[in-house]
Amino acid sequence: MEADWDELSRIPVPPPSPHGLPTAATTIAFDDVSELLWAGNEFGRITSFYGPELQRYTSVRAHPVSDGPVRQILFHERGVISLSPKSVHMITRRGLTQWHISHEEMTDLYCMSLTAQLNKIIVAGCQRAMFTIDIDKGIIVDKLHTDHNYTLMKKSRYLCAATDTGSVNALSLTDFRVVKSWKSHGTAINDMDARNDLLVTCGFSVRHLGSPIVDPLANVYDLKTLSPLPPIPFHAGAAYVRMHPKLSTTSFVASQTGQLQVVDLMNPNAINLRQANVSFMLGIDISPSGEALAINDAECSIHLWGSPSKIHFNEMSKEVEFADVVPRPPPLDWSPDTPLNMIGMPYYRERLLSAWPSHLVFEVGSPPAPIDQSLIPYLRPAEMGHYAPNPKKTRRYQVENTRALTTAEPALIAPKFLSEKAREQNKFKSEASVSDTAEALAGAKLNGEAEDDPLLKYSNVEIKYSRFGVDDFDFRFYNQTTFSGLETHIANSFTNALLQLLKFIPLVRNLALHHAASTCIYETCLLCEMGYLFDMLEKANGQNCQATNLLRTFSSYREASNLGLFEENLTTKSLSSAIQSVNRFFLNQIAHDFRMIVPSSDDLDQRLSTIASESIRCMFCQNEIVRPGNSLANELIYPAIDIKQARRNPAFRFSNILRASIERETQNRGWCNYCRRYQQVTIRKSIHRMPLVLILNAALSNPICRRLWSIPGWLPEEVGIAVDNGQVMCFEGDELKTQLQNKLPNLVVYELVGLVSEIDIPEHQKPHLVSFINVSISSRELEAKNRWHLFNDFLVTEVDKDEALRFNQPWKSPCILAYQAKDARHAVDDSWKNVLDITLLFRDWSLNGGRAVETRQTLTEEEKPTPGTPVALDTEFVDLEKAEIDVKADGSQEIVRPSKSGLARVSVLRGSGVHEGVPFIDDYITIKEPIVDYVTQYSGIKPGDLDPRTSQHNLVPLKVAYKKLWLLLNLGCVFVGHGLASDFRKINIQVPKSQTVDTQYLYFHPGKNRRLSLRYLAWAVFKEYIQEEPADNNQGHDSIEDARMALRLWKKFQEYEDAGIVNQILEEIFREGSKLGFRPPPRNGVATVLSRPGTAVTMQNSSGRNTPSTPDVGGAATATATTSAPATPRQAFRRSIALTPSNGTFGGPGAGDFFGGSPLK
């Protein structure tokens, strides 16, 4: 080892699979033919690395996982030979398999070596048979009996073989008889090497403490005279050794802690020391040239040592083959204006394939059927491919028509749009029409064919979009209950079923809402988002909702992306395993978010956490470590099942499986600090306290266990759990009733709140998730009757308990179960509304340094909103994704997915008081997602306005802006605006109609079938111009101006109501609008203000900006569509004291007597 030797490269050992964790290499070896370093792992995979940079070259699964780890790699001119406990495998250096040999007597192979015949190798191990294998033919040519268990082999003058008792046998290279034997070490030989006439060994011996430790001596033997030589002292413990390939008496000796020693065997005093930067060394190897040294450590890394100027693996290496470089096509000057005839066509003399005659087209075999994704977890490797149990989704002798379309029509046909129903309303008698939803969910096909279809309500549901957008879709077709469903067409919306389940667990719901009402403003707080979602679902009262903000927060977690929990990763894993992984992530993140505000986690632990301790005991030295083993989600562990005894054997009852899963005991390989190596360890959990909410992952990975669930009544509605001195007792059925009568101490009875199931109907191919929930548990009414509901995204319907808990259908599989303590039934806590932390409304919050905002004046404590306080609201949005439109062959267009918008600006104005009309919120929202269009001419948002580095506005995260609106909502404020339904949907907040005043519906004439734009209403009522055509694309709407105009229109409408002239005013507005096309006329310098029919007041115009008017959707469609939108019916409108008209003063910017002074007074 020269003076400039040092570590040149360090690489991690590649994981066994794309999503697996790295594991330490079990063996490493330098190739003696090419510049390659090879490594094997415990999963049977061998990987090669090229050159000093250790670039990955090939990676091959040489042995099945069931065969065990790769224990040795041997090289031949024709290829690379690897050995595992049960097989021998040979590949080319490019990774192509040459042969694979396994034998019934190959049970524990450890080592192999070349023999005197270079085309044969001998393999041996801790077994009574050795095998001679012909490398050229790939067959076993001889089987030899042996009385020794061999663990290492090295070829030199003799075949040196180490036994598992610490001896070394010198075997003849011809007949493999034992020529000489030495007792080299006390217990075992860890490593050895033989070259020319010398053999060096390292091993373990038992000292006075009784446990084996590394010997401080490396033993040396002369193979020429078959006699021992003086050993090499190595006080750090000689664990590994390699002989130098060129210097016959020089060897490398290494310790487990990384100390390297280069020593001359003939002169032990001449040594050279180095220290490798490793925590625990697992092996070394030296290259055939002697210029490189590889080190394998326990931290899953490979280190390469050598001289930077001289390093090479072989003296004469064969050139390593690499894939041919694909030639790049010549660049083309391609633009939208490039004519196609400039591209040109290649010259040809033969007939083109496109001219293939039709009479030569024949149908051959059908394409193979796609692999059922539900079988992936059950696949087992075989010699040829994999096999799995037959799911029996088709009848006997029935095959799949693979020539049919890959996507089947959904069983539940989408309803007609609301606009279509409105047009057809006059064609049919109302008595003859029956509720579409009742027909569909009762089993009648929507095409009129009365045919029972019990799978109808389990079908995939999809939202269809007309030219009027999502508002034209009839969600009530799918849900006529008071419980709201969740929409699809949102990234990661496959979690809808899990979110519904968590919402209906009262203790989880209370936890989320109390946290949302706290001081938390962390941008990525998942618990806050759950609180907002749960509040929205309750306020919606059966109207469809969407989890946009929560799923956006979920999508922002890098940990979730690394775990493959997002929708784009579902192609590689089953939906069932994905939602169970999401469940674990949600619970862990909830606990993390809760502790961010409340460091003491007693409340959380009492509700969700199983308090336990985990003991880890080494099976070799009996050393035991105890550590906390708390868990938020428990996975069911199933025993080995004989299905014939499943009904009679008590061990197969749900309660017993639950008990074994909670206090699980497993055996695994783990690191033992006392033994300083990986050993077999036993892991056992001791339970100290059970939570009030018990969430279980079904973990169905075995079709045999699936049959347990198909037993009627196997899943109980109630289970009892008692913890006594760390032991868990579970009861169900009559046994639970007996224990309740006996008043067993510490017994907690849990009732089933609901479960998430995977639905995989073969006819529809696309699996999805639904939830079955007992909604009575979270009801505020103390009703004793249980009512089960199916939540299939936005399809919600009541089902029988037996249907919810029945799993004897192959298309329905359980995923997640949720139990809650029966004492917490109806424990719905709304006290969070009384402890809302509203300090956010009274202080400035900014991401970009708290820049001064002249457009707003923050609320004071005296202006604290109270129920009924009016506030004017307007928002602006930018486009994050454009709409996805399908253009059909006839030229018609269908919206497949609407555009996705992001909230960019929120303006909220005072609606009453001295500072009426003055903004107290004017926030720009920073957006981390790519923005495809700022729509500046409509939104007024310019590039750079939402960037904290360049923005001149008050920037806040979406969480802060949303929480301000949520606080105003729950304080009882009344929101005044124009077109609020669209704004609320994009903001993702649910505002009850009683807290909404929308001027779009106030100024609506029932007989005119048209909604008026804010721009036209401003001119018609006040003769003012707003939203005028911008001079350039850098101008647009001003949300403060729009909100103030909506507030003024509402105030003026109240005056019309007080005077009793609403109908006359509306007639005049629509009469004038029909003449002008419902657009303000061009400016002429002077206009008249409409005060009452036939009366006019002259005033000067004010400036403003312009956007297109609301389009005339025409017909009865508009009238029908308005019934589902938030509105304020004039007949039912009751004005509180806070909603009284203005006193004629206005203290905001641009003051004027616009809020009063009406001639009507």
Curated annotation (Swiss-Prot):
Q: Which PROSITE patterns match?
A: USP_3
**Can you give the residue ranges of the USP domain?**
453-822
Q: Where are the WD repeats?
A: 20-59, 276-315, 1009-1060
Low complexity bias locations: 1116-1129
| Cofactor comment | Binds 2 metal cations per subunit in the catalytic exonuclease domain.
Main localisation:
cytoplasm
What is known about regulation of its activity?
Positively regulated by the regulatory subunit pan3.
Domain of life the protein comes from = Eukaryota
Principal EC category? hydrolase
Catalytic activity, as annotated? Exonucleolytic cleavage of poly(A) to 5'-AMP
Q: Where is the composition biased (Gly residues)?
A: 1145-1155
Tell me which GO cellular component terms the UniProt record holds.
P-body; PAN complex
Which of this chain's residues are annotated to bind a divalent metal cation? D874, E876, D983, D1042
Q: Where is the composition biased (Polar residues)?
A: 1097-1110
The record's section on Pfam families has: PAN2_N, RNase_T, UCH_1
- Linker: annotated span: 316-452
Protein EC: 3.1.13.4
Q: Where is this region: Disordered?
A: 1092-1161
What keywords would UniProt list here? Cytoplasm, Exonuclease, Hydrolase, Metal-binding, mRNA processing, Nuclease, Repeat, WD repeat
Provide the GO biological process annotations: mRNA processing; nuclear-transcribed mRNA poly(A) tail shortening
Q: Which family does it belong to?
A: Belongs to the peptidase C19 family. PAN2 subfamily.
UniProt cross-references to PANTHER family, sorted A to Z: DEADENYLATION COMPLEX CATALYTIC SUBUNIT PAN2 (PTHR15728), PAN2-PAN3 DEADENYLATION COMPLEX CATALYTIC SUBUNIT PAN2 (PTHR15728:SF0)
Query: By what name is this protein known?
Result: PAN2-PAN3 deadenylation complex catalytic subunit pan2
Q: Which organism is it from?
A: Neosartorya fischeri (strain ATCC 1020 / DSM 3700 / CBS 544.65 / FGSC A1164 / JCM 1740 / NRRL 181 / WB 181) (Aspergillus fischerianus)
Taxonomic lineage per UniProt?
Eukaryota, Fungi, Dikarya, Ascomycota, Pezizomycotina
Question: Gene name?
Answer: pan2
